[in-house]
């Protein structure tokens, strides 16, 4: 059972859009997509009040940089529990991780959340302890008891060239331990952040500030990696409101986008993952 109410009219519109891909001569493309689409009736909804439709929303895919949303929420949870110290450097890393999608910043965040560091291969008891610590974020996600999170994996750093040393070992010989998320899991977390339903309302407001994207054309031209152009936000008018976290690599392009026509209008959000 999803966290939103199934809406037959939305399901029909989504199916028509997928049929349109077939009509455009791309009949196999729909099988490379995973989608969760939710709309609300109130301008300031609470969690669980949405209605929506989906396609392949339970499929676990490599999320690329969308996983950084989960790491940002984890930071706020760790801070609330006094598990890590507050610092200007941590906040700088948080901003760069979400606003600019910095992999370097994400590396620091994962180190702080798990008490681990990258480096040469480890063995024996040291390796077992390291891997146990690296799974702390997964343990927290399971403690939320959200059914959408049951099969997810959020334990790896994000890379430009790829992992080395103990990080490569932790990926597994067949990369079977890569990060993995579904659109419905990501949708549940995005809704929680945007409705103040995870960690605390003040923490969610800080996270919302990091996720906010400018739709101003001049600002977007000045930043070629703005996480708007080439993603769902590109189709919005400049006066709309957008909060999002994108992910991209050579084989895939993902987006988690929450948007409103104005502060007085009900929001919608869409999670779109692609795979090769």
Model-predicted segments: where are they?
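Active-site SXXK
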Residues: 61-84, 97, 269
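Penicillin-binding protein/beta-lactamase superfamily catalytic region
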Residues: 160-220, 265
């Amino acid at each position: 059972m999803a966290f939103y109410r199934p809406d037959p009219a939305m399901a029909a519109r989504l199916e028509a859009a997928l049929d349109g891909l077939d009509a455009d001569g791309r009949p196999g493309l729909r099988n490379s997509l995973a989608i969760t689409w939710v709309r609300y009736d109130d301008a300031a909804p609470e969690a669980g009040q949405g209605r929506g439709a989906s396609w392949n929303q339970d499929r676990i895919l490599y999320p690329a940089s969308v996983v950084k949303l989960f790491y940002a929420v984890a930071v706020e949870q760790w801070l609330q529990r006094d598990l890590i110290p507050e610092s200007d450097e941590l906040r700088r890393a948080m901003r760069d991780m979400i606003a600019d999608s910095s992999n370097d910043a994400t590396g620091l965040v994962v180190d702080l959340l798990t008490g681990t560091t990258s480096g040469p291969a480890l063995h024996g008891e040291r390796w077992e302890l390291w891997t146990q610590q690296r799974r702390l974020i997964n343990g927290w996600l399971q403690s939320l008891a959200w059914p959408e999170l049951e099969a997810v994996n959020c334990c790896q750093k994000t890379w430009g060239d790829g992992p080395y040393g103990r990080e490569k070992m932790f990926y597994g010989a067949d990369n079977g331990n890569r990060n993995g998320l579904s659109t419905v899991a990501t949708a549940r977390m995005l809704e929680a952040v945007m409705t103040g339903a995870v960690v605390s309302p003040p923490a969610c407001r800080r996270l919302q500030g990091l996720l906010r994207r400018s739709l101003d054309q001049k600002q977007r031209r000045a930043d070629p990696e703005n996480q708007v152009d080439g993603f769902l936000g590109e189709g919005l008018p400049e006066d709309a409101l957008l909060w999002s976290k994108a992910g991209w690599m050579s084989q895939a392009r993902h987006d988690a986008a929450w948007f409103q026509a104005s502060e007085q209008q009900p929001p919608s959000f869409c999670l779109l993952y692609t795979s090769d």
